[in-house]
Regions:
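N-terminal targeting signals for export/organelle localization
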Residues: 1-23, 218
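A short beta-strand-turn-helix
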Residues: 21-39
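Functionally engaged cysteine thiol sites
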Residues: 18, 22, 95-96, 165, ...
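Short pre-active-site segment immediately N-terminal to redox-active cysteine/selenocysteine motifs
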Residues: 40, 45-48, 81, 189
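Proline-centered helix-kink/hinge sites
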Residues: 50, 61, 191-192
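C-terminal cap of thioredoxin/glutaredoxin-like
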Residues: 9-10, 14, 46, 138-218
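N-terminal secretory signal peptides
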Residues: 39-43, 50-54, 217
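Structural alpha/beta surface segment adjacent to cysteine/selenocysteine redox centers
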Residues: 45, 54-140, 183, 215
């Protein structure tokens, strides 16, 4: 009877929220979710891609809530860099601790219209600076012109830390390698999604969620 009372009064077991489980893969991509989940959705992304920003705004949080948080699916972000602005933002986001990647990733895509407008309106002399010198020189110039130092500063990254990452191949080379690997496989547009290694025709949030609804078992 005493055991029954203890059992009755015990708190129910807490289910784990797997969106707090972020890891970095051997190739430098970022993975969120249950490491034992059988299903994996991969997104090949560019930070200067309008459809990528639309997916982040319209479907990413719902996808994480329904499939990642519950442990049913893992979600991986790989880069398919399109230009020096994209490379600079990707390097900056990779400069953060692994646990902060998806927060900053989402923030940069959701605010894309603001900082990309600065890049689009850059003068010829500004754009010339983006092409001159070392990778560090180029990315520092872009970061200054689009306000990246301030944006990533909100995530705890100092200017000197970001500058160090711009000059560190250990930070930016995996992004370049992911891009080369994607290109070799014929992935030239973004976003491109793969579910368990099978490329999807879907690129919109609505279509991706429809595929997941029919493919991921509860």
């Amino acid at each position: 009877a005493f055991a029954a009372v203890l059992a009755f009064g015990a708190a129910p077991p807490q289910s784990k929220n797997f969106v707090t489980n972020v890891t970095r893969t051997a190739t430098g991509s970022h993975l969120i979710g249950n490491p034992e989940a059988k299903d994996t959705l991969v997104e090949f992304v560019s930070y200067t891609c309008g459809h990528c920003a639309a997916f982040e705004r319209e479907g990413a949080e719902l996808m994480k809530a329904q499939y990642v948080a519950t442990g049913r699916m893992k979600f991986e972000v790989r880069h398919r860099v399109l230009n020096v602005v994209d490379m600079t933002v990707a390097t900056g986001v990779h400069c953060l601790p692994t646990a902060k990647f998806f927060t900053a990733h989402s923030a940069m895509l959701r605010s894309q219209d603001k900082w990309l407008a600065k890049a689009s309106s850059a003068t010829a002399s500004q754009q010339a600076r983006w092409k001159a010198g070392t990778p560090r020189d180029k990315m520092r110039a872009v970061a200054s012109d689009i306000g990246l130092y301030d944006m990533l500063g909100r995530h705890g990254l100092s200017r000197s830390q970001l500058d160090n990452c711009f000059g560190d191949p250990a930070v930016y080379q995996p992004i370049t390698d992911q891009t080369a690997a994607a290109s070799k496989r014929g992935i030239n547009g973004t976003p491109t999604f793969e579910l368990n290694g099978v490329r999807l025709a879907a690129i919109t949030a609505r279509d991706v969620l429809f595929v997941l609804e029919n493919a991921i078992k509860r």
